């Protein structure tokens, strides 16, 4: 039996695994011994979640990240872990570039000003090929973003302790240099529970004045209050987020009214192509996880490791 997170559609699993597994959203207590795999999207899975199912051999998360899984505990129990790390790399890179370009051209602040009755722009608009983009995390997504940006004549630098220097001739710089010299900073690093934000108040303060910050990765990577303070002070010209501390955010969250802040509803991954790709990748990953001996597990990667 395969237990699927109710937040996920059942059809991809029921159709692809018909005849192999009984796919359910829940199991009766007397059926617990039949469960061999758990499928989640963002629901945490650790000792408490797998304890009722002694026959579980694999956990699949339909996501690029695994920070909601207790990888150490699952490995200790001999439970294989699979994820869907590549299905939306192009979509997230596209979304990040769109945010960077919109920030440099002031699109969301100008639109708000016009709707409020304004017409004379107060925002400094920027020419793309005169800007520098700093990418934190040069894995699959970061590399795709770099290629797209360079095609527009944008100077690209990166900070990533995992990816070797010289990759595609993209300059590696320290985090301090990236923050202080980049006209936009885009984050593409994994989150790590219990670790301080990669960009805290001190790091935000070191960013180039008037820069744009883009975070499509994990809300925990950035001190949101420090970003809001920097926007209010004019230190940053814009910030775009596709992730938030609580999703969806409370309607009365005062940070949502911050000028220069763009928040999209965690849709950076989305496209018809990605919607099909995650299904294919999930089924393939689950089959591998269930048949690999000894079990293969995703390796935990700290936010300090960057590459995703």
Predicted regions mapped to residue ranges:
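Rossmann-like adenosine-cofactor binding region
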Residues: 45-47, 161-254
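Hydrophobic Val/Ile/Leu positions in short beta-strands of Rossmann-like dinucleotide-binding domains
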Residues: 2-3, 133-135
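Short beta->alpha connector loops at strand-helix junctions that form conserved
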Residues: 27, 62-63, 79-90, 160, ...
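Phosphate-binding beta-alpha-beta segment of Rossmann-like dinucleotide-binding domains, i.e.
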Residues: 85-132, 144-147
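Rossmann-like dinucleotide-binding domain for NAD(H)/NADP(H)
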Residues: 210, 216-308
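Glycine-rich Rossmann-fold phosphate-binding loop(s) that bind the pyrophosphate
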Residues: 6, 138-139
């Amino acid at each position: 039996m395969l237990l699927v997170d109710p937040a996920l559609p059942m059809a991809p699993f029921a159709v692809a695994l018909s005849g192999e597994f009984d796919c359910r959203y829940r199991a009766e207590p007397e059926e617990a011994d039949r469960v061999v795999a758990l499928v989640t999207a963002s629901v945490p899975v650790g000792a408490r979640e797998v304890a009722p199912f002694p026959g579980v051999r694999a956990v699949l998360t339909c996501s690029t990240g695994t920070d909601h899984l207790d990888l150490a505990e699952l490995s200790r129990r001999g439970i294989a872990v699979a994820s869907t790390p590549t299905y939306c790399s192009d979509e997230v890179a596209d979304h990040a570039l769109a945010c960077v370009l919109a920030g440099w051209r002031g699109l969301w602040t100008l639109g708000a000003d016009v709707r409020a009755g304004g017409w004379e722009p107060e925002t400094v608009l920027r020419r793309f090929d005169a800007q520098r983009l700093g990418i934190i995390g040069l894995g699959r997504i970061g590399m795709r973003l770099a290629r797209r940006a360079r095609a527009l004549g944008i100077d690209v630098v990166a900070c990533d302790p995992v990816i070797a220097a010289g990759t595609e001739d993209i300059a590696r710089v320290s985090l301090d240099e990236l923050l202080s010299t980049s006209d936009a900073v885009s984050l593409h690093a994994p989150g790590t529970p219990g670790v301080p934000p990669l960009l805290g108040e001190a790091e935000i303060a070191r960013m180039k004045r008037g820069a744009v910050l883009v975070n499509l990765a994990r809300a925990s990577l950035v001190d949101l209050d420090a970003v809001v303070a920097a926007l209010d002070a004019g230190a940053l010209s814009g910030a775009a987020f596709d992730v938030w501390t609580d999703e969806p955010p409370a309607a009365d969250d005062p940070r949502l009214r911050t000028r220069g802040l763009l928040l999209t509803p965690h849709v950076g991954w989305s496209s018809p192509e990605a919607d099909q790709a995650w299904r294919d990748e999930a089924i393939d990953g689950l089959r591998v996880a269930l048949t690999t001996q000894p079990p293969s597990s995703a390796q935990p990667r700290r936010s300090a490791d960057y590459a995703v």
